[in-house]
């Protein structure tokens, strides 16, 4: 298993968060990112059988069942992501029944995904219907 900190998708997310903060686009905890990852991107870095915990989604996301997302945490600041990604980000997989996020990595302080994740996931569902290469929602 490769070290998660060496994953290109994680480093891209850390750089994006740092740049958005540096440019003043997301002050304090004013923005969020959800990055849809291909299973092949994550398989070298995760034990797919090791679910750290389940976090209820509060809606039916079955359409995204089995999909992986790297997501900013609730109440987290973009400026802190690069220094401590494992606290400020989480890598989740949508459960088979679409009711939960299976935490695979991150949110090590007991945190959870942004409260806006349902809106992000609904946006991903809609965009994927018209663009199969779609992979990010950010604001």
Where are these regions (language model features)?
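An anion-binding catalytic pocket shared by soluble metabolic enzymes
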Residues: 4-134
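Conserved mixed alpha/beta catalytic, RNA-binding, or beta-rich assembly cores of soluble enzyme
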Residues: 137-138
